[in-house]
Every structure is written in structure tokens, then in C-alpha cells.
Amino acid sequence: MKKIIMTGGGTAGHVTPNLALVPELKKLGYEIKYIGSIEGIERKIIEREGIEYFPISSGKLRRYFDLKNFSDPFKVLKGVFQAKKIIKREKPDIVFSKGGFVTVPVVIAAHLNKIPVIAHESDITPGLANKLATPYCTRVCVTFPESVKHIKGDKAVLTGTPIRRELLEGNKLEGIKLCGFKDNKPILLIIGGSLGSKVINEIVRKNLDNILSKFNIIHICGKSNLDENLENRKGYVQFEYVNEELPDLMKASDLVISRAGANVIYELLALKKPNLLIPLSKKSSRGDQILNAASFEKSGYSLVLKEEELEDKTLMKKLNYLYENRNVYINNMSKSKMDNGVKNITELIKKYTK
């Protein structure tokens, strides 16, 4: 049996694309193992799927000054030795890396063991982890056509992003039932990313009366961000994080407010959900979400509201405009030729399996 080790972590965006590949890889006869960080969000997600998980040490990679920048390289080095030992023992035929700081030691260790590595970059420009890992990769899959020029060497392959099959098979009635909505108001789904978004949470709750006058709200607010004072608010349902329920909640929603991570916006495109994107500002990111959002806005798939312009009036104005013009966005998304990347990526994995 062929064996693959997958890696990726830090946020759900570095894990869920791996899960999208799992059913197809199993169908192709691959035994699947996973290397991730000790305490990252990926551990719970992967172990829930029944996949054997190997934790390693991993230091965070930063583009800014921090005292931990002096100690974290040693954690990365430790992670390389741990990953090298795991890879030598498990003898995988190939490694698939989805990015995030934990992947750097795994990719280096695979290279040292002469194991081919396929990486995937979701955003238009590569994150720091993938930048560091690219020299050790066999091929780098990219989601956006604009990304090819940002990958050094002749390694980039335009594959699209892998989307979980089950996400496309949600049940609208089950989603509505889960939320307990009784009227026929349109449903607004708010997603702040797997770690939540304080900025989005605060402005939504501040404008709750205005929004609830037109919409029922499903609010995925992130771990430890529930507001107990709103538990019994009619038309408002909040979740820290959802997994199995997400397809039903997506299917039930009419509009979506979201950050602009590449994975989630391609899921919204696949589901043809009119969306308002609020990308992370450059103050708190490298600007990748701004580029992602601009690309989708240019294609007519999304309406964008910059975080710096996020105010009560601008939020309501954009939300009302999106709802009034929702069919325009649905039609634009229906014309998209972007493939689900699962088939393209698994074909590449097959090609380079030792």
C-alpha cells in the first residue's frame, strides 16, 4: 500500500484542504498519516477523522521583531530532527504540505530523506512558511492564476483549491432546524475564521438590532468569543466553531460575511453564496487577504469592505447593497470556470509518488 504523510496547521485554513483530499487518496489506496504541532488546532481536527497524528516541535515564523524570534529557530531545528525520525520510521512514498509554520521542518526532513514533496499555496502570494519550504518541494500547487509568478523556479502548478465534498451536500432544512429559526427572513452567516475575529464580532453585535430587523443571523464567532448575554436573542444563533454542521449552515444561508482567506472564499464561490468580504488589514497580516478579496471583487464574485472603513454605516450600506444585488453575484459565480482542486492535486500526488 502507498503511504502519504500530510502536514499543515496553525489555522483551520491549513488543515481543511487536507481533509478534502483524504477520501480521494483513500480511494486511490493511500495509507494516510499526519504530522502537526503539539497544541495546534489541527490536532483535534485530524484525530477526529481517525488519522494517526504525530506531534512535533514547531516555532512560529514571524516577519516582525519579537524576542521569541531568538528561541523559535531552535524549536524549528528540533522539529526537523523529530520529523526526520518519523519519516524514516514511517517510510512514506510522498509528503503533502498545506502550509503553516509546522510544515517547514516536515518539508526539510522529507527532503533530507529524499522523499518527494507536493505543497499547496492557497493565497495569491506565498506565506512565509511556503516561501521557506519551496526550495525543498518537488511541486507547489497554487489556487490563483496570479500566483504562478510568485513561486520561485519552475515548480508552480495551477490546480485550484481542494474543497470538501460534504460541504457541497448540505441540507437547508437541517440548517434552519439547528438554528431554530421560525420566520422567513433571509439568513446571514457570519464567519470570522477558525480563530474568530474580534473586529467583526464587535461590530456585528453593536449593530444587532439593525441587522436583525432584516435578517436572521448565524454567527460563528471563534473559540471563547460567545456572548452569554445574547444566548436567547431571537433570530441570533452563535457558535464558537462548527465542523459537521457547517454544510447545513452554509446551505441555509442567503448571504455571508467573511474574512478573505483563500479557502473560505473558494468554498463560497463553489456554493455560489453572495458574500461581503472583510479582509484582514495590513496591520495584522501580510496583506494576503486584501489581494484575495481584490481578485474576487474584480471577478464580480464578492463585495469588499476594508477593515479600515468598517463602521456602522458602511457595514449596513454594504449589507443592504449585497442583498439587493444578490442575484448579480450568483450569476457571476455561476460563470466561474474554477475547478475543485481535489482531482488536479491527487493526480499530481500520483505522478510523483515514489
Swiss-Prot record:
Q: According to the UniProt entry, what is the EC number of this protein?
A: 2.4.1.227
In its UniProt entry, the species of origin is given as Clostridium botulinum (strain Loch Maree / Type A3)
Q: Supply the alphabetized keyword list.
A: Cell cycle, Cell division, Cell membrane, Cell shape, Cell wall biogenesis/degradation, Glycosyltransferase, Membrane, Peptidoglycan synthesis, Transferase
Pfam families according to UniProt = Glyco_tran_28_C, Glyco_transf_28
Query: InterPro entries from the xrefs?
Result: GlcNAc_MurG (IPR006009), Glyco_trans_28_C (IPR007235), GlycoTrans_28_N (IPR004276)
Question: What is its subcellular localisation?
Answer: Cell membrane
Please name the HAMAP family in this protein's record. Answer: MurG (MF_00033)
The main place the protein resides is: membrane
Organism domain of life: Bacteria
Q: What does this protein do?
A: Cell wall formation. Catalyzes the transfer of a GlcNAc subunit on undecaprenyl-pyrophosphoryl-MurNAc-pentapeptide (lipid intermediate I) to form undecaprenyl-pyrophosphoryl-MurNAc-(pentapeptide)GlcNAc (lipid intermediate II).
The residues that hold UDP-N-acetyl-alpha-D-glucosamine are 11-13, 164, 194, 289
Molecular function via GO:
UDP-N-acetyl-D-glucosamine:N-acetylmuramoyl-L-alanyl-D-glutamyl-meso-2,6-diaminopimelyl-D-alanyl-D-alanine-diphosphoundecaprenol 4-beta-N-acetylglucosaminlytransferase activity; undecaprenyldiphospho-muramoylpentapeptide beta-N-acetylglucosaminyltransferase activity
Protein known as: UDP-N-acetylglucosamine--N-acetylmuramyl-(pentapeptide) pyrophosphoryl-undecaprenol N-acetylglucosamine transferase
Establish whether keyword Cell division is in the entry.
yes
Q: Which family does it belong to?
A: Belongs to the glycosyltransferase 28 family. MurG subfamily.
What is the primary gene name for this protein? murG
What broad taxonomic lineage does this protein's source fall under?
Bacteria, Bacillati, Bacillota, Clostridia, Eubacteriales
Annotated membrane topology: Peripheral membrane protein
